Swiss-Prot record:
Source organism phylogeny: Eukaryota, Sar, Alveolata, Apicomplexa, Aconoidasida
Cofactor: Mg(2+)
This protein's UniProt keywords: Cytoplasm, GTP-binding, Ligase, Magnesium, Metal-binding, Nucleotide-binding, Purine biosynthesis
Pathway: Purine metabolism; AMP biosynthesis via de novo pathway; AMP from IMP: step 1/2
Cellular component annotations (GO), alphabetically ordered: cytoplasm
Amino-acid positions noted as binding GTP in the UniProt annotation, renumbered to this chain: 25-31, 53-55, 62, 307, 313, 339-341, 425-427
Keyword Metal-binding: yes
Ligand binding (Mg(2+)): 26, 53
Binding locations of substrate: 307-313
Cell location: Cytoplasm
Protein name (database record): Adenylosuccinate synthetase
Residues at which IMP binds: 26-29, 51-54, 141, 155, 232, 247, 311
Coiled coil: none
Family as reported in the entry's similarity comment: Belongs to the adenylosuccinate synthetase family.
Species in which this protein is naturally found: Plasmodium falciparum
Length: 442
């Protein structure tokens, strides 16, 4: 489905499209991003680091991407890593090598993105182990994301642009590592080995490190088609998510502007990716969680194990109040509903349409969401029940080919969100995507 060339006749929204996760991540953003990357000129990441990830299949070959945007798989596409990211350069180089080809020639790295060092990962593990002993673990990926954003916020981090002048980088590196070793009582760390690696990165990457703000805005002025790829998802946002069980970056639409340096009026279309049920990895409130056979059914049939960590994901029913809250923040124009096929075989499907205060019976106000753990404990879900379907829907190519009960479920979600569901994922492969042809875009 090609937004950029307006194959949907009643969509003419411009050249800049953002694909954002609308839940706790793992919504299946990779498929729609991959589909649209083929038609874009530039694909961008604006936030996070190697804590995100998806597996993409192109020409029967699978690629596991954690830092690079999906556009790297297409020779006509330029890939950009924005200033809002934290980049573990060793992981980036390994990923570049795994993709192969002349990828470096079409990759641009922001000079303002921060470098994530191995010591950040060590600190992440130290902090998480301490929290585990205290019973307060967050459930991080231990990829060093939080500690790197911490050094950024503390104004002692090192930006990629520094790597262009290696002598300057070496001095800043020594000061940072010595400070962190002292602060966290780390007695052994091979600085010389890491510095040698970074000298090689300096040689290979110095011409790829640019002022991405200027680069992006010049390309926008030239009407290039830009696809912006969100990492993680809205409910993991550092400000708007279920704090403190969140990631360390801005995962919502505001992060697009601060993480790439583009003007908010340049963004034309926001696509929210929504899984047909709900999952989350790690700790934190989950009001529709299913700790029963249905939850296990969803986990196994949906292969709900983390791309990055391989941890089993917690599973539950779709949460409409959450999506309304996320829609308010992100101004979502369209929805890609994923993994509808996983619901096939269930006798009954529940849809959370509101939350009720356990004591007062008062319903949650529209657009609000109990993101704080202590407040969420005061609420219980209000469900609408739907009959399930037994049919295998993976061969469905049109909306009208879906079982009636599946269509009722989709239309109910649209009704509550007042947002068109344009793409419907009905299987694991790229071809297993229904595109609804008739919808209204407000």
């Amino acid at each position: 489905m090609n937004i950029f060339d307006h194959q949907i006749k009643n969509v003419d929204k411009g050249n800049v499209v953002a694909i954002l996760g609308a839940q706790w991540g793992d919504e299946g953003k990779g498929k729609i991003i991959d589909m649209l990357s083929e038609y874009s000129d530039i694909t961008c990441r604006f936030n996070g680091g190697a804590n995100a990830g998806h597996t993409i299949s192109v020409n029967d070959k699978k690629y596991a991407l954690h830092l690079l945007p999906c556009g790297v798989l297409y020779d006509n596409n330029i890939s950009v890593l924005g200033n809002g990211m934290v980049i573990h350069v060793k992981s980036l180089m390994e990923e570049i090598e795994s993709v192969g080809g002349k990828l470096l020639d079409r990759l641009y790295l922001s000079n303002k993105a921060h470098i994530l060092f191995d010591i950040h990962q060590i600190i992440d593990s130290i902090q998480e182990t301490k929290k585990l002993k205290e019973g307060k673990q967050i459930g991080t990926t231990k990829r060093g994301i939080g500690p790197c954003y911490s050094t950024k916020a503390s104004r002692i981090g090192i930006r990629l642009g520094t790597l262009k002048n290696f002598e300057n980088f070496k001095n800043m590196y020594s000061k940072l590592i010595d400070h962190l070793m002292d602060l966290y009582n780390i007695t052994e760390y091979d600085k010389e080995k890491e510095l040698n690696l970074f000298y090689n990165y300096h040689i290979k990457l110095r011409d790829r490190i640019v002022d991405v703000i200027s680069f992006m805005n010049t390309n926008l002025e030239n009407n290039k088609k830009v696809l912006i790829e969100g990492a993680n998802a809205a409910m993991l946002d550092i400000d708007f998510g279920t704090y403190p069980y969140v990631t360390s970056s801005c995962t919502t639409v505001g992060g697009v502007f601060s993480g790439l340096g583009i003007h908010h009026k340049k963004l034309n279309l926001v696509v929210g990716v929504v899984k047909s049920y709900l999952t989350r990895v790690g700790c934190g409130p989950f009001l529709t969680e299913l700790n029963n056979d249905v939850g296990q059914y969803l986990r196994e049939k949906g292969h709900e194990y983390g791309t990055t960590t391989k941890r089993p994901r917690r599973c539950g029913w779709l949460d409409i109040p959450m999506l309304l809250y996320v829609k308010c923040i992100n101004s979502i124009d369209m929805i890609n509903l994923t993994k509808l096929d996983v619901l096939s075989g269930l006798e009954e499907i529940l849809l959370c349409v509101n939350f009720k205060n356990k004591k007062t019976g008062e319903l949650l106000e529209k657009g609000c969401y109990p993101v704080e753990e202590e407040i969420s404990e005061e609420y219980e879900p209000v469900y609408e029940k739907f009959s399930g379907w037994k049919e295998d829907i993976s061969t469905c190519n049109e909306f009208d080919e879906l079982p009636e009960n599946a269509k009722k479920y989709i239309l109910a979600i649209e009704k509550y969100l007042k947002t068109p569901i344009v793409w419907i994922g009905v299987g694991p492969n790229r071809k297993n995507m229904i595109v609804k042809k008739n919808f209204n875009l407000n």
